[in-house]
UniProtKB/Swiss-Prot annotation:
Entry annotated with the keyword Ribonucleoprotein: no
UniProt keyword Membrane present: no
Cellular component, GO annotation: chromatin; cytoplasm; nucleus
Family: Belongs to the YAF9 family.
Name of the coding gene: YAF9
Domain YEATS span(s) in chain numbering: 9-167
Description of how the protein assembles with itself and partners: Component of the SWR1 chromatin-remodeling complex and of the NuA4 histone acetyltransferase complex.
The organism of origin for this protein: Kluyveromyces lactis (strain ATCC 8585 / CBS 2359 / DSM 70799 / NBRC 1267 / NRRL Y-1140 / WM37)
Database matches in PANTHER family: PROTEIN AF-9 HOMOLOG
Record protein name field: Protein AF-9 homolog
Length: 220
């Protein structure tokens, strides 16, 4: 007996959909929400989004964020866009994120973690604050920890494939824009930074190799 259409998968085919996930955070100062505990110092938002701000609810059913157990009702279920939540706190911790896909997908949920970042990174060499690569309209007093990823659906069922094809969700812009920094341009910039870093490390290794050689053989 042939499998029902909902479970019939399209062999040797994969479909990808880009997402960004992460958090923004800033010190509350005197603007403390009325229900925030007195020891909380930061206001933060964690999210799962499309890199260009497009709708992703056509293939994502819900997103579940599991916060630190000290929060009331730490398991937060977001069943409609935007898939995000805002809270207050004083410390950084791991947030478990689970993405559930549309019912017709017949796909398992996607499970991963994000380290909630409240404080900026300080470059140990320059002693200056390092800004995130995603600099799209981020105030100076705001911390942003955002990551790009692609969800890969291998051999999707026919109905889900049709759903995914109903919207062009895999377009990747060539250049950065004020509202979308993730692009081929950013990808190339990251590759260039890696090459520069690799050359620097190779140079330092050669220096240490020479020092080690001289230490072992003073006549070298």
């Amino acid at each position: 007996m042939p499998a029902p259409p909902v479970t019939k998968r399209i062999k040797t085919l994969s479909v990808t959909r880009p997402i960004i996930y992460g958090n923004t955070a800033k010190k509350m100062g005197d603007n403390i929400p009325p229900n925030a505990p007195k020891d909380h110092t930061h206001l933060w938002t964690i999210f799962v989004r499309d890199p260009r701000g497009e709708d992703i609810s056509y293939f994502i059913k819900k997103v579940v964020f599991k916060l630190h157990e000290t929060y009331p009702n730490p398991v937060r279920v977001i069943e409609a866009p935007p898939f995000e939540l805002t809270e207050t706190g004083w410390g950084e911790f791991e947030i478990n994120i689970k993405i559930y896909f549309a019912d017709v997908s017949n796909e398992k949920m996607l499970n991963f973690y994000h380290h909630l970042r409240l404080h900026p990174y300080i470059n140990p060499e320059t002693k200056e604050i390092e800004r995130s690569n995603d600099e799209s309209e981020v105030p100076e007093d705001e911390v942003k920890a955002v990551y790009f990823d692609e969800i890969v659906f291998n051999e999707p069922v026919e109905q889900f494939f049709q759903l995914l094809m109903s919207k062009p969700g895999n377009l990747f812009p060539s250049n950065k824009t004020p509202t979308c920094v993730f692009s081929r341009q950013l990808e190339q910039e990251e590759i260039d930074r890696i090459h520069i870093g690799t050359k620097k490390i190779d140079k330092e290794i050669k220096v240490y190799e020479q020092k080690l050689k001289e230490a072992m053989d003073p006549n070298a």
